[in-house]
A protein has these predicted regions:
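Non-catalytic, surface-exposed connector residues within folded enzymatic/regulatory domains
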Residues: 1, 43-44
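A short, Lys/Arg-rich alpha-helix, primarily the initiator
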Residues: 1-12, 51
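Short basic helix-loop element that most often maps to the first helix and adjoining turn
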Residues: 7-20, 56
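Short alpha-helical DNA-recognition segment
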Residues: 17-33
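DNA major-groove recognition helix of helix-turn-helix/homeodomain DNA-binding modules
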Residues: 44-60
Length: 60
């Protein structure tokens, strides 16, 4: 699975839209949009950190 697909799946698992998700992580909306569209590549380390934060939030 490509990183952009993992990012989309992660966002959808939170129930947030693109704007909410990008604001939650402090990422400019345009950057996030480019990641999801595949125009730019999301750094893998950043995706893993976002996954970790989402997982920790669900546990609390």
């Amino acid at each position: 699975m490509e990183l952009k697909e993992e990012l989309i799946r992660l966002r959808e698992s939170t129930g947030m839209n693109k704007k909410q998700f990008s604001e939650y992580f402090g990422i400019p909306y345009r950057t996030f949009q480019d990641w999801e569209l595949g125009n730019r590549r999301v750094p893998e380390y950043l995706l893993r950190l976002m996954e970790y934060k989402v997982r920790m939030e669900k546990l609390n």
